[in-house]
Amino acid sequence: MTNLRKVHPLFKIINTSFVDLPAPASLSSWWNFGSLLGVCLAVQILTGLFLAMHYTSDTATAFNSVTHICRDVNYGWMIRYAHANGASMFFICLYMHVGRGLYYGSYTYSETWNIGILLLFATMATAFMGYVLPWGQMSFWGATVITNLLSAVPYIGTELVQWIWGGFSVDKATLTRFFAFHFLLPFIISALVMVHLLFLHETGSNNPTGIPSDPDKIPFHPYYTIKXILGLLFLLTALSTLVLFSPDLLGDPDNYTPANPLNTPPHIKPEWYFLFAYAILRSIPNKLGGVLALILSILILAIIPLLHTSKQRSMTFRPLSQCLFWLLVANLMALTWIGGQPVEHPFIVIGQTASVLYFSTILILMPLAALAENKLLKW
């Protein structure tokens, strides 16, 4: 008798995606982050659902409702901190996943890559709106500063900002709509994940060598399910350590002060995972220029397939490109650090230098290095 998982209409889909899926035999741990992102999304949706049961999206009660969750709800503090730190884990996995794609040339699967960029934007939007919900000082002022960036749009900027605010400042209407969208977007992300996987399974996975692996495939289960479980254990260990021992490590102390429109915090900054983009935004003195640089710092990923000049797909056998890749990683870390510093000398100059280096590495240096490698390897 044929196995049920191979004939049942629903189980068949799961079977071809996670059980009998032919996978390259040489996948390294860098291929773990896709499954870890799935786990992160599930954790965020579950913890978020329980938080939404107790949260009220009203300016008068939002801050107090979060306090109530932490003090009075059974394990509410744990759910809240799992959600907040789960977002940090989500972005760590996201950046690792994107970095893996850049290093091993996975961006040549253009549909999968473009859906991935959409997913990145959707996740960033969700995280930004989630940061506003506790209605602390940094929530309020972060929302004010970031939404105000839209006023740089020529001609319709001011109207656009007021339309998003639902008034003349960040207020009750803004908080209510941000809560609605923060609740809705993860489900849209889940749907996009399905499309992401659909396109990936059209081509099959890339592998560390960048060479087609059709002659050498192994079943996904048990080889990669056990590998994914090991990665999951590492993720859950890191997350629970953060939640149970140092839940506020990555947060901002200002967010424990209720939002006050009359009192501006000395340093307004977003969560750590947006600091690199925030540093690029602040590096440009012109408002519209800064906003464009901010958007392009992420959107630049979309043109990376067009900038691929190497005859090889992966960077595994390309030492020059490897050096530039790790320079880019170090540069992003420097930008993250600068984004958290005040706008004063020498941080301004460091931020501007790192921003120029970020764009020039991707747009000029990496394509040139790839061409040089083609010559060196006589390809």
UniProtKB/Swiss-Prot annotation:
Keyword flag Heme: yes
Record's cofactor remark: Binds 2 heme b groups non-covalently.
GO biological-process terms attached to the record: mitochondrial electron transport, ubiquinol to cytochrome c
Transmembrane feature ranges: 33-53, 77-98, 113-133, 178-198, 226-246, 288-308, 320-340, 347-367
Gene3D superfamilies: Cytochrome Bc1 Complex, Chain C (1.20.810.10)
Record's subunit section: The cytochrome bc1 complex contains 11 subunits: 3 respiratory subunits (MT-CYB, CYC1 and UQCRFS1), 2 core proteins (UQCRC1 and UQCRC2) and 6 low-molecular weight proteins (UQCRH/QCR6, UQCRB/QCR7, UQCRQ/QCR8, UQCR10/QCR9, UQCR11/QCR10 and a cleavage product of UQCRFS1). This cytochrome bc1 complex then forms a dimer.
Ligand binding (heme b b566): H97, H196
Described purpose of this protein according to its UniProt entry: Component of the ubiquinol-cytochrome c reductase complex (complex III or cytochrome b-c1 complex) that is part of the mitochondrial respiratory chain. The b-c1 complex mediates electron transfer from ubiquinol to cytochrome c. Contributes to the generation of a proton gradient across the mitochondrial membrane that is then used for ATP synthesis.
Residue sites binding a ubiquinone per the record: H201
Entry protein name: Cytochrome b
Coiled coil: none
Cofactor(s) listed in the protein's UniProt record: heme b
Main location: mitochondrion
Taxonomic classification: Eukaryota, Metazoa, Chordata, Craniata, Vertebrata
